[in-house]
């Protein structure tokens, strides 16, 4: 079997804020939340590239599906890389991400 990544799922505490961050702040394509009619079913799929999606799934629902108890969230649970070719490009990506966080959360701690 040749491994192939098709869906990368991230457990989130607030699905709507996460949707706003990725869609409105970072400009990633999505149709929004689906499966909201089902208990533990709401999810957001974001198109990353051909055949690869990012799924935002409430942490409690993800734990429910896995048959485990939900754990407290932490900043070191997961990271996603975004490769760039220069420091100015990295700075621009970071500024866009910070602006998206401010828009989604309303505040951002100073550095």
Give the positions of each predicted feature.
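Residue-level signal for secondary-structure boundary sites
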Residues: 54, 64, 88-90
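Short beta-strand/turn micro-motifs at beta-sheet edges
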Residues: 65-70
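Core segments of cupin and vicinal oxygen chelate
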Residues: 11-54, 59-61
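Vicinal oxygen chelate
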Residues: 13-16, 77-111
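Short glycine/proline- and charge-enriched loop/turn segments
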Residues: 71-75
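N-terminal beta-strand motif that seeds the catalytic metal site of vicinal oxygen chelate
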Residues: 1-19, 37, 77-82
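A short, local hydrophobic-aromatic micro-motif
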Residues: 6, 29-31, 105-106
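Residue-level detection of beta-strand scaffold positions
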Residues: 7, 43-45, 90
């Amino acid at each position: 079997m040749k491994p192939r990544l098709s869906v990368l799922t991230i457990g989130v505490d607030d699905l709507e804020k996460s949707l706003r961050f990725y869609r409105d702040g970072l400009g990633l394509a999505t149709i929004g939340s689906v499966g909201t009619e089902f208990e533990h079913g709401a999810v957001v799929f974001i198109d990353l590239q051909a055949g690869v999606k990012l799924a935002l799934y409430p942490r409690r629902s993800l734990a429910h599906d896995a048959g485990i108890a939900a754990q407290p969230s932490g900043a070191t649970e997961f990271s996603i890389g975004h490769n760039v070719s220069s420091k100015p490009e990295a700075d621009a990506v970071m500024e866009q991400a910070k602006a998206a966080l401010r828009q989604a959360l309303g505040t951002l701690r100073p550095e």
